[in-house]
């Protein structure tokens, strides 16, 4: 069982970016659907850092098998402040894996 924060959204895939020290950083993309205020929906993309240890354990293969599927992603949240900038970063949690969930279809 997971205690903490879960992001629920559609898995978009993973990519690799370079950190400031030029080492690779793996990132998971999660699409979050939300109402657009006009009767439709739009999608925000949350970027979740993947720790090197999880990359080495094969989590990127799991992510690739879940592309396009609705999932719950366990994350750790960290606020930061550096060089006059502030932000929040999300990191994939070691506590539990990414879980595919059933899509609910609402009929009006």
UniProtKB/Swiss-Prot annotation:
The gene is V. One of its GO terms (molecular function) is DNA binding. Homodimer. One of its GO terms (biological process) is DNA replication. Belongs to the inovirus G5P protein family. It comes from Enterobacteria phage I2-2 (Bacteriophage I2-2). Keywords: DNA replication, DNA-binding. This is DNA-Binding protein G5P. InterPro entries: Putative_G5P (IPR035411). Binds to DNA in a highly cooperative manner without pronounced sequence specificity. During synthesis of the single-stranded (progeny) viral DNA, prevents the conversion into the double-stranded replicative form. G5P is displaced by the capsid protein G8P during phage assembly on the inner bacterial membrane.
